[in-house]
Amino acid sequence: MNYIKQFILAICFYLVLTCQDHVLARDTTTRDIVVPKISEWQVTVANGLTTGETLFIHCKSKENDLGDINLKFLDRFSWNFGENMLHSTLFWCYMSKDDGHMNVKVFWDDVILFHRCDWKNCVWTAKNDGLYLWNSAIGEDVLSEKWKSGW
């Protein structure tokens, strides 16, 4: 009887650890309520368009839709989350400005990305010619994606 209880407890613990993340607030997920995060991340998107135009962004993952955001020049939008146990967490954003748009991944499981983000904080900046990622390893913004023409 003791082994059955231990087995059921082990199964329950496994299910809790592998449950999908759902963003409840800026820095809380459903898994955080039961189990601490293994790795916590923050993604930031900033409007660095020197033309003064508004940057429209719509970011989401498989489980979380962060909604439509309009960023004025120098405004930022950030969110926090814990990477899931399967290391399959993926966030992407649609972004547009007056004369361009793009669909771009802003977080995925990749050691090179993690190194550039200093293993905790990915900062993306929309500039006139495209989207840049702050590379903390070299201390500068690096062009990641160019704008596509049109809306």
From Swiss-Prot:
It comes from the Eukaryota. It is found in: Secreted. Residues 1-25 form the signal peptide. InterPro entries: Self-incomp_S1. The gene is SPH74. It comes from Arabidopsis thaliana. GO terms for biological process: rejection of self pollen. Belongs to the plant self-incompatibility (S1) protein family. Its main location: secreted. The keyword GTP-binding does not apply. It holds the Pfam family Self-incomp_S1. One of its GO terms (cellular component) is extracellular region. This is S-protein homolog 74. Keywords: Secreted, Self-incompatibility, Signal.
